[in-house]
Amino acid sequence: MIKRVLTALAATLLPLGAHAADAITGAVQRQPTNWQAIVMFLIFVALTLYITYWASKRVRSRSDYYTAGGNITGFQNGLAIAGDFMSAASFLGISALVYTSGYDGLIYSLGFLVGWPIILFLIAERLRNLGRYTFADVASYRLKQGPIRTLSACGSLVVVALYLIAQMVGAGKLIQLLFGLNYHVAVVLVGVLMVLYVLFGGMLATTWVQIIKAVLLLCGASFMAFMVMKHVGFSFNNLFTEAMAVHPKGAAIMSPGGLVKDPISALSLGLGLMFGTAGLPHILMRFFTVSDAKEARKSVFYATGFMGYFYILTFIIGFGAIMLVGANPAFKDAAGQLIGGNNMAAVHLADAVGGNLFLGFISAVAFATILAVVAGLTLAGASAVSHDLYANVFRKGATERQELKVSKITVLILGVVAILLGILFENQNIAFMVGLAFSIAASCNFPIILLSMYWSKLTTRGAMVGGWLGLLTAVILMILGPTIWVQILGHEKALFPYEYPALFSIAIAFIGIWVFSATDNSPEGMREREQFRAQFIRSQTGIGIERGQAH
């Protein structure tokens, strides 16, 4: 009984993970050049470059660059967060998962949402009241600035680097798939555009790129879902009946549990994605773009609504693809497989319901999706270097101008590194990188953010030991696990049997923080505990926070 409950829980928690990561790592067959898609995409690029130009005229200070001056509303920020979080892997990956496995796809898509109530109830308000530009501002509020900011920046940069590699390789593969462009050209194109957005437009341009992309993605997905439902007379019963009639698995597509093999791995990945969401630097950074805690709370509310709606749409799109794409020989190759692989299910459905023009629109939106995500990641990485490391550790008292200069140099370096890594990892299995990024965010960033805000006995010693332990455990266990040790390094048997380390590394991080804080009797530790009350009052009331300035 317990095993069944565990498996069910794991199935609910285990979102996209390796399966949907296939959307960005699966077999790719280059498609013929799609001119409609290229024209639509060029229109999107022209619009976003104009926004970057407009934003660059308004970026006058450090606050403008990192947080858009704190002038973004809760609704706008909610849309931007949704735009930052709904990746191409979730659009193409989940619909492909539903196309192949049916009901299981819904379980996976809902898993992505599980982390958001944690952010809403535990983190959003206090984070906004205590921080200015990065989550390290919050973690180091009453702890020692140097060591804590160094740890937070390292955690952020590792997460950003891993996530960025996955997105860049995904971008290259996807563009090769959708547009028929060369992989290297695609990676360079994404890298250059990402640098332009962030270098000149800062957070303001990044926010609007994410908002536009979210609106386009939601509109495109809504139209596809509407056309699918129209085809079946707006009856879910007809949708499922027709899908079961044409799917090779028949009625089995309506039963759950086919994708979860090992409850521990599933639970571990589920926890990693759930708590990792609350430790992703580019997501946490978005809470400083609003004026106060109330707007921060609204942001999460709207973001969760948009994402929940989007994942329901992907479910309808997946079943629509079974019915309209799976049963249509025009979308199959000579071997009876879907042209371009299963990850093209949603793209073929766009062709089936809206013709070539709509196919071009959806292809362009899929590319825009990646651009929005990498822009947010780059800005988070740059702020970790310039604000946390340069201005608060290496060169205390640096002027705003010097800090911004370092930030912009970092953006350029990150752009070059992202392009090189994207080309280097072209043929590698990058599915594990998203899982590892979330595991590190959950094992290093999340425990420190949570306990610094809620646990009065936390000290610098505990945070440092626990944070580094969590980060190193996540990386070491991932290397010793089946993905890297067996598949990439070629050993016969993995030293660590589970694919994802989060269950173990999160536990080690929390235990490490608790043990080393509880046993810290130094005068410094005592002083840090005494300062909790002042921090608590500020986190509840927001007295003294920087509010948005009118431009």
From Swiss-Prot:
GO biological process terms held by the UniProt record: plasma membrane acetate transport; sodium ion transport
Any Pfam family hit: SSF
Residues passing through the membrane, by range: 8-28, 35-55, 78-98, 105-125, 151-171, 185-205, 208-228, 264-284, 305-325, 357-377, 406-426, 430-450, 465-485, 496-516
UniProt topology in membrane: Multi-pass membrane protein
First-listed, main subcellular location of the protein, grouped into a coarse class: membrane
General function of this protein: Transports acetate.
Protein name: Cation/acetate symporter ActP
Organism: Klebsiella pneumoniae subsp. pneumoniae (strain ATCC 700721 / MGH 78578)
Taxonomic lineage of the native organism: Bacteria, Pseudomonadati, Pseudomonadota, Gammaproteobacteria, Enterobacterales
